[in-house]
């Protein structure tokens, strides 16, 4: 299976790898996993007073497609509102990275992680 240039780029030069302080009330953390393939993804967002995602970090244990999906998701989330971030779909990630059908689940994980991080943030703020 050949990976697209974008997958290779995000895999070899992942953006926003790291960790934010999960105890910070302005940070939401999403942790998701796919037991079928062993991929585990932690995605975190830091939201400013205006409700804009000012930072996003990830740590992914998994294949190149999972790492690339996480990296791209964090890039796309920065500068967006929570509502805008929640509109990011796995199909958009898969299309942007030209993921083969057998790797689509990696983009699903990224979408799930985005939603989980937003949900965690809203829960911390009493918005849910």
Swiss-Prot record:
Gene3D superfamilies, per database record: 3.90.1010.10
A Gene Ontology BP annotation from the UniProt entry: iron-sulfur cluster assembly
InterPro entries hit by this protein: ISCU, NIF_FeS_clus_asmbl_NifU_N
GO cellular component: cytoplasm
GO molecular function annotations of the record: iron ion binding; iron-sulfur cluster binding
Domain of life from the UniProt record: Bacteria
Described function: A scaffold on which IscS assembles Fe-S clusters. Cluster assembly on IscU homodimers proceeds sequentially from 1 2Fe-2S per dimer, to 2 2Fe-2S per dimer and finally 1 4Fe-4S per dimer. Subsequently IscU transfers the Fe-S cluster to other acceptor proteins. It is likely that Fe-S cluster coordination is flexible as the role of this complex is to build and then hand off Fe-S clusters. The clusters are very sensitive to O(2).
The family this protein is said to belong to: Belongs to the NifU family.
Subunit relationships: Homodimer. Forms a heterotetramer with IscS; each subunit of the IscS dimer contacts an IscU monomer.
NCBIfam families noted in UniProt: iscU
Protein name: Iron-sulfur cluster assembly scaffold protein IscU
Source organism per UniProt: Azotobacter vinelandii
Species lineage: Bacteria, Pseudomonadati, Pseudomonadota, Gammaproteobacteria, Pseudomonadales
Gene name linked to the record: iscU
């Amino acid at each position: 299976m050949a990976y697209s240039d974008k997958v290779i780029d995000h895999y070899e030069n992942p953006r926003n790898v790291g960790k934010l302080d999960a105890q910070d009330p302005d940070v939401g953390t999403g942790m998701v996993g796919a037991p079928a393939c062993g991929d585990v993804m932690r995605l975190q967002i830091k939201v400013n007073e205006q409700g804009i995602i000012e930072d996003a970090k990830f740590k992914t244990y998994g294949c190149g497609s999972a790492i690339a999906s996480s990296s791209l998701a964090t890039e796309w989330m920065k500068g967006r509102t929570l509502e805008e971030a929640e509109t990011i779909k796995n199909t958009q990630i898969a299309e942007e990275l030209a993921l083969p059908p057998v790797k689509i689940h990696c983009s699903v994980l990224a979408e799930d992680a985005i939603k989980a991080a937003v949900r965690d943030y809203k829960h911390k703020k009493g918005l849910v």
